[in-house]
């Protein structure tokens, strides 16, 4: 004989949680907006403005993820209740197990939607840029920066995000001095925003013939791509624009033309650069887009005293602003903010970051 009371309790719990989310996420307004967006996308002239059409498509996906999930929860819980009644009437354990399996699936769906509640920031749904900067320490720090770059690229690709390397400056011997990547996809910035900070590596250096332990630092800085219609006043006189020859992998045209562009915002010292296109004009446009995004993020941080100022994040690559410690000899990676720790160091370096990211989001960092 199967126990029905615990299952009924779970159904009641999931129903209550679904109703809470329905109110919190403003289901009625989102459903109405989804109908409006669908109507706009059905207009034959919608693709006359490709950027507008793409924005609507992105908005539709975001709305559907909420509206459809809540609809599925309501219908699914009704279906499970019906299956449960059938199982009791027929004393059929197979039908009971089917109801429990369906309930497990619904619980997982709801948990994912509840997790998305944490993406409530203005730009959490935006695409984002990730800057990686090697700290002092020469080759060892530069190798660590390249390991971080690989880790984030692996994480993003595993989660289905699109990645693009905007700029990469190679180290003298190995690794990289710096890199900027763009990560595109739903809630890219929301997922990655708590990764800003200093990452500390402790290991026996492969570049030390004595095999001694070395401590290296590299920083990650995450900032959202901002909409073109946001007014950010940049005085052209405050900008220094340099062109240079691209370095690194890039085919036969690398180093032949000065197509790479570096822009410096003199009042703040913020630097953006792009070298991933053969066209200097396109690289300049991309670097300006990043500059706009960085200046916007700086303004937001100034308004929020709890966030670190961008200058600190970019300049203090040392003990002060550490977020995570990677001690490879002891097989231990620990997040210094949440206390989350794992001994599976290789999995983390291969992109298994969700446990750290989810804990930091749940902690409200």
UniProtKB/Swiss-Prot annotation:
Locations listed in the record: Cytoplasm
Any one Gene Ontology BP term: viral translational frameshifting
N5-methylglutamine carried by residues: 252
GO terms of molecular function: translation release factor activity, codon specific
Keywords: Cytoplasm, Methylation, Protein biosynthesis
This protein's GO CC annotations: cytoplasm
Keyword Transport listed: no
Keyword Cell division assigned: no
Main location: cytoplasm
Family: Belongs to the prokaryotic/mitochondrial release factor family.
Summary of the function given for this chain in its UniProt record: Peptide chain release factor 2 directs the termination of translation in response to the peptide chain termination codons UGA and UAA.
HAMAP family (alphabetical): Rel_fac_2
Miscellaneous comment in the UniProt entry for this protein: The gene for this protein contains a UGA in-frame termination codon after Leu-25; a naturally occurring frameshift enables complete translation of RF-2. This provides a mechanism for the protein to regulate its own production.
Alphabetical list of PANTHER family matching this protein: CLASS I PEPTIDE CHAIN RELEASE FACTOR, PEPTIDE CHAIN RELEASE FACTOR 2
Record protein name field: Peptide chain release factor 2
Organism in which the protein naturally occurs: Salmonella typhimurium (strain LT2 / SGSC1412 / ATCC 700720)
């Amino acid at each position: 004989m199967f126990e029905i009371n615990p299952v009924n309790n779970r159904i009641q719990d999931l129903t209550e949680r679904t109703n809470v989310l329905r109110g919190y996420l403003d289901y009625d307004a989102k459903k109405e907006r989804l109908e409006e967006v669908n109507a706009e996308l059905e207009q034959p002239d919608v693709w006359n403005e490709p950027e507008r059409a793409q924005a609507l498509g992105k908005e539709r996906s975001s709305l559907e993820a909420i509206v459809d999930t809540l609809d599925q929860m309501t219908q699914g819980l009704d279906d499970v209740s019906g299956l449960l009644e059938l199982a009791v009437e027929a004393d059929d354990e197979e039908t009971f197990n089917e109801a429990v399996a369906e309930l497990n699936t619904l619980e997982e769906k709801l948990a994912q939607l509840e997790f998305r509640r944490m993406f409530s920031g203005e730009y959490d749904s935006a695409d984002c840029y990730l800057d990686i900067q090697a700290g002092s320490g020469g080759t060892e720090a530069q190798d660590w920066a390249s390991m971080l770059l690989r880790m984030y690229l692996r994480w993003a690709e595993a989660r289905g995000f699109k990645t693009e390397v905007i700029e990469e400056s190679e180290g003298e011997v190995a690794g990289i001095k710096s890199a900027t990547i763009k990560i595109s996809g739903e809630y890219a910035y929301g997922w990655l925003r708590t990764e800003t900070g200093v990452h500390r590596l402790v290991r026996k250096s492969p570049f030390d013939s004595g095999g001694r332990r070395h401590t290296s630092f590299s920083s990650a800085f995450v900032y959202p791509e901002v909409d073109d219609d946001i007014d950010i006043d940049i005085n052209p006189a405050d900008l220094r624009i340099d062109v240079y020859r691209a370095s690194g992998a890039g085919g036969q045209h690398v180093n032949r033309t000065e197509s790479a562009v570096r822009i410096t915002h003199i009042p703040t010292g913020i630097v953006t650069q792009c070298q991933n296109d053969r066209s200097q004009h396109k690289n300049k446009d991309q670097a300006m887009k990043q500059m706009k995004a960085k200046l916007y993020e700086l303004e937001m941080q100034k308004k929020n005293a709890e966030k670190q100022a961008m200058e600190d994040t970019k300049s203090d690559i040392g003990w002060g602003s550490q977020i995570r410690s990677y001690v490879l000899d002891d097989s231990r990676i620990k997040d210094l903010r949440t206390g989350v720790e794992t001994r599976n160091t290789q999995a983390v370096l291969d992109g298994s970051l969700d446990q750290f990211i989810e804990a930091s989001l749940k902690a409200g960092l």
